């Protein structure tokens, strides 16, 4: 599977365990660079944006390859919308 810069991805990292939703910048032998938020914050993040409340922004980060357990493209599946589609439906904004 080929990933491109700008793809919306879900990254699972270890040591410590993290799940991130973000916009991929690059993948290199050394690691992954992406603009992301913690996936556990997604619902609160969307709610805060809709309510016009203060919220954390996506941040640019580099994750060394030894921490990357899995990288998946954020895609819809059957009746389940992608995280990016859910974000757009809930906030009226595009992710990325």
Which residues does each predicted region cover?
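Conserved RNA-binding domains used in RNP assembly and mRNA/RNA metabolism
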Residues: 1-96
